[in-house]
Amino acid sequence: MTNEFANNAPAERLHNKRVGRELAMQYIFQCTLTEEKFSAASWNAFLEQASEEHNLSTNRYGRKCREYAEKLIEACVSDSERIEETIRNVARNWAPERISAVDHATLKVAIAEMLNFPDVPPVVSIDEAVAITRDYSDERACDFVNGILNAVKGTLNRPEREGIKA
């Protein structure tokens, strides 16, 4: 599972939150496939490999990417039951085993962000999750992820952010 997110020139690099979301999704995906528990040791091993693979240096940009990924993973772990229940509630017609591991990991990260990061508008979480799905899955999965996350957005007890008025 490789994406070229960090191999770009600095001016073209993706926002560190985007890279953090991808790292979190990749780590959750890896833990799902290996049935490994989330731990500092497995996270550090993953980061070592991901940092090399994606050329994430120890500079401020790389550090910010890792920090955001860690916050998302912590939210995924601490809120795991609520996230899984949310997925079950909004994906009523989908048996959990029908959701691919990549799409499930992407949903978990996006839902964790929507539930726990009030400074991030839900539409941003949705757009980012759909973009990540497009990079790691397929177009049909994009529609599925978008539909699930829009349904989650409808259940949130958060005020919508207003756009800037001209």
Predicted regions located by residue number:
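N-terminal interaction/assembly modules
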Residues: 1-135, 140-142, 146-166
